[in-house]
A protein has these predicted regions:
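Charge-dense, helix-prone N-terminal extensions
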Residues: 1-141
Length: 141
């Protein structure tokens, strides 16, 4: 039987600092650090905040005031999600990303009129496709 993972960082009073994230992410913590470097290299700002509607801490990643990526912590990995209007989906599939990533994006259900591109960051290998999709998001209007 399949076990469904649940989002971590649900305690409003516990800020997701380095020690908290190391505990939640475990071996994937180094990939998270690589992810932060990727954001820094692309002049993106990131900030953890508790969202009452979702009852969890989320990290919003922005270029100037535009949200590019949303991150959430799960047991053993960081999830990074980039939302696109439907009109960009065909262009995403033209990017040089792996077929596995394209398959995941294609199978993910839309949220309203947006398509979430979800990446499970368990190791640094996952950062390549994320970076390509993220840079495409930065270029779109």
């Amino acid at each position: 039987m399949e076990t469904i993972n649940t989002i971590e960082l649900t305690d409003e009073n516990t800020f997701p600092d380095k020690s908290v994230l190391k505990k939640v992410l475990g071996r994937s913590y180094n990939a998270y650090v690589g992810l932060l470097k990727l954001y820094d290299n692309n002049d993106l700002a990131y900030e953890w905040r508790y969202y009452r509607d979702g009852k969890a801490w989320l990290c919003k990643v922005q270029k100037k005031k535009r949200t590019i990526v949303w991150m959430s912590a799960w047991k053993g990995y960081m999830q990074a999600t980039i939302y696109f209007p439907e009109r960009y989906i065909d262009d995403i599939f033209k990017l040089s990303i792996t077929d596995d990533t394209k398959d995941i994006i294609q199978k993910t259900k839309n949220v309203g009129k947006s398509k979430p591109c979800i990446f499970e960051i368990r190791n640094k290998k996952a950062l390549g496709d994320l970076e390509k999709v993220m840079k495409f998001k930065i270029l779109t209007k």
